[in-house]
Amino acid sequence: MLTGNEIREKFIEFFMQKQHKHFESASLIPDDPTLLLTVAGMVPFKPYFLGQKEAPCPRVTTYQKCIRTNDLENVGRTARHHTFFEMLGNFSFGNYFKKEAIKWSWEFVTEVLKINKDKLWVTVFTTDDEAEKIWIEECNFPKERIVRMGESENWWSAGPTGSCGPCSEIHVDLGIQYGGDENSKIGDEGTDNRFIEIWNLVFTEWNRMEDGSLEPLPKKNIDTGAGLERIAAVVQGKTNNFETDLLFPILEEAGKITGSQYGKNPETNFSLKVITDHARAVTFLVNDGVIPSNEGRGYILRRILRRAVRHGRLLGYKDLFMYKMVDKVVEKFEIAYPDLRKNVENIRKIVKIEEEKFSNTLDQGIQLVNQEIDNLLTNGKNKLDGEISFKLYDTYGFPYELTEEIAEERGVIVLREEFEAKMEEQKEKARSAREVVMEKGQDSFIEEFYDKYGVTEFTGYEKTEDEGKLLSLREAKDRKYLLIFDKTPFYAESGGQVGDQGKIYSDNFAGKVLDVQKQKDIFIHTVKLEKGMPEENKTYKLEVDVVKRLDTAKNHTATHLLHKALREIVGTHVQQAGSLVDSEKLRFDFSHYEALTEEQLSKIEDIVNKKIREGIEVVVSHHSIEEAKKLGAMMLFGDKYGDVVRVVDVHGFSTELCGGTHIDNIGKIGLFKITSEGGIAAGVRRIEAKTGYGAYLVEKEEADILKNIEQKLKATNSNLVEKVEKNLETLKDTEKELEILKQKLALFETKAAISGMEEIGGVKVLIAAFKDKSTEDLRTMIDTIKDNNEKAIIVLASTQDKLAFAVGVTKTLTDKIKAGDLVKKLAEITGGKGGGRPDFAQAGGKDEGKLLDAFKEVREIIEAKLV
């Protein structure tokens, strides 16, 4: 019996013997900006199939890690649904075609995997006579086990137009015990669990035109995908993927941690399978650099992880456990994916932090969902308002899918449309709140300008002064104008770097450039007029503020050094999440799960400053995207790059794709100083820093503060720490003494209060106000008085910071008078709110002027109850 690892190895070996080149699995974060995650084995090769790029070699084979969450709710319920899965694939880019693809798949399935030929079935596209003929003549496959299927099952296309073609699928018949009878075939009703697809062969041979007609492609391609989990189940004689050697050790670990037994009942099986699948998905996602967040791929990770945590609760396990599952996943998959072992500690940390966050709100979220469902069912309804599911998501971080799953378990429908409407409403508010850079109607103007003149020629990499012909002049606000020239040395804001500033002038005109933006590579200069009025079709001198440009360039190059240093000290999971570079400072947002320590920040500063002192040359070059990748250039996932990219290289340290302006030698940065580090969103941190003279000023300010402290403490630099520690120790002793005095004073005041208590109906009553008591002080007084009196009612107020009340009633009297009732009356009269238990309650008030009225009314209530 072959193991999962052996199946992988044999697949790659088989196709390498057929002259295929083995490509390592690509990241789950694809280069394709249209995709959040790698969802199929062909995703890394999409540009070659679409003809956007030339393939590096004609034949390729891979095992590719993939993630799909479109049917997340089915994961755990069925034997074969997964979020994470592996696709074995062989690909041809204009090389071999149907005959070889079919013959080799048959050879591998029957001779290498040794699957019983009599159990195999094949599907082909309705009109694909060629594929059927190859199966029959080349593989000696029986025609009666070939089923022709329509476009929805056996046709692949990249979209409504473009590359497309028929498919042929290999299925395994598990037997009539899984549906149908001896005459059943693929596609018959009730046979979904009987005929299991294990391999899909896609023959990309057509180009669909706008009118729907098909034209033959000049180069025909092969794209195949075989699900490793399904193949392992068939080869190992399992009807459930979770019982294969790929997943069962992880499932056993889930049972061991949660104290649950697989096979005990369907509910336990369901939850254990969810945890097993999701532990694998979470481990691989975090390993590839995904951080939990509320959007994009980070939200997909969060949904998967939180669903698993909930299923731990369903098994009765309330402690953290998902981070512990990481070890078993790594142990199982590190042979095929060795980087898992290198990153295991980082993965555990990120998973644990996210699990801790959610555990704090999970029970509350589940309780709220169930309360809402109880209310519905009590009133004979079964539809949950979308506003409720949105509130759970927005306020408590409770994923919509969990609300939906809990509701479904109780027979309630969640109104998804209402939830999505609330989400869209929130997004619209966010969109409206953003600053609009271009005025209304500007977009259509840009389109017209582009059609007429094309793009602006940018000369700013080579020079900071140039002449440009004014092609367009549009009035903005406050004597500002938007100017577009045929060419410009002014850098337009992009890639986090702000636009250049400077001046534009001629003999009879002068204007100050405040900002430069671009749309469709058309550079739009925002100019404040200082003299005269510019005219279209005239040539003007364009001059960049070189001091600001140089300072901005220093900060931009320093940002690259910071990025690299972060990855060295914090971990390679660090990815850029945003940046801002101007002449005064730099700001860098990055993916990370916790605050950086002072030690880490110090090391990062040291690395950057050490590099600056080395005075390394900064080299800018242009390469194809493939060449840039070979150079190890860092690039932003999700960004769309052209065929030729600009590479900024600090030799031996940092290599990044970047379109910004940089200094030619990092020694010119002078000094690098981090000024702040903090969180800006879940899983995203921000560092702000200064360079050069700005960094010197920060250092000087800190030195001046230190000098001032030394003078005040009469200390020197060498004994300052010792002096501060001594003063802190003295302060601590003084605070202890003060606390003892306060306790003595409180005891004295309490005794005085007790001696002054009046008696109403045989009950000791104290109603008093204090100016310098905290709510905790009031509570202590009440407890002391109650301890010394069998029957007592204490009503206290404090006006220390704001009006506050505390009321105590001995338990011998709570059947007659409740502290909560008295405190509510006090709060009501003074315009506040409060409540509590029958024996103790607290409240806040707003109107101190009503305090005596409140005391008077409470006294009357007490007298009425006791006399």
From Swiss-Prot:
GO terms for biological process: alanyl-tRNA aminoacylation. It is found in: Cytoplasm. The gene is alaS. Keywords: Aminoacyl-tRNA synthetase, ATP-binding, Cytoplasm, Ligase, Metal-binding, Nucleotide-binding, Protein biosynthesis, RNA-binding, tRNA-binding, Zinc. One of its GO terms (cellular component) is cytosol. It catalyses: tRNA(Ala) + L-alanine + ATP = L-alanyl-tRNA(Ala) + AMP + diphosphate. The keyword Coiled coil does not apply. SUPFAM superfamilies: Class II aaRS and biotin synthetases, Putative anticodon-binding domain of alanyl-tRNA synthetase (AlaRS), ThrRS/AlaRS common domain, Translation proteins. Zn(2+) binds at residues 556, 560, 658, 662. Belongs to the class-II aminoacyl-tRNA synthetase family. This is Alanine--tRNA ligase.
